Regions:
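C-terminal amphipathic alpha-helical interaction region
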Residues: 1-121
Length: 121
């Protein structure tokens, strides 16, 4: 279903197609990352940074939802539809890009959280 939304967005053209391309790239990034993380065999390190993974994945899901709404709103007059498009613009300009640093952190297999010791509190 997500790929159907991306395909519709790409076919629609304009800024909706740009957003569809951004979403497609983010989906690819998280899919590649997931394979890398589980392939690393370092499950303790991977799970120590689970909150960053969940946040990135959640942003990608929300981008999909905003893309669906933008596809429905594009070309329709009225404040309601313009508001939907502006909200999608905001999300794709400011929120979806946050997945890049999260994915980079996850890819680095950072041990900061895992290496914390209880007696250091």
């Amino acid at each position: 279903r997500v790929q159907d939304t991306v395909d519709r967005g790409l076919a629609q053209g304009g800024e909706v197609a740009d957003w569809a391309g951004q979403l497609s790239a983010a989906i690819n990034d998280i899919a590649v990352l997931t394979a890398e993380l589980w392939g690393s065999g370092q499950f303790d390190v991977v799970l120590a940074n689970a909150s960053a993974y969940l946040e990135a994945f959640g942003h990608i899901v929300l981008a999909w939802i905003w893309l669906e709404q933008a596809e429905a709103a594009a070309g329709n007059p009225g404040d309601f539809y313009q508001g939907k498009l502006q909200a999608a613009r905001y999300f794709f300009a400011t929120e979806l890009p946050k997945t890049g640093p999260q994915i980079a952190l996850l890819r680095s297999l950072d041990r900061t959280s895992l290496d914390m010791q209880a007696n250091w509190f």
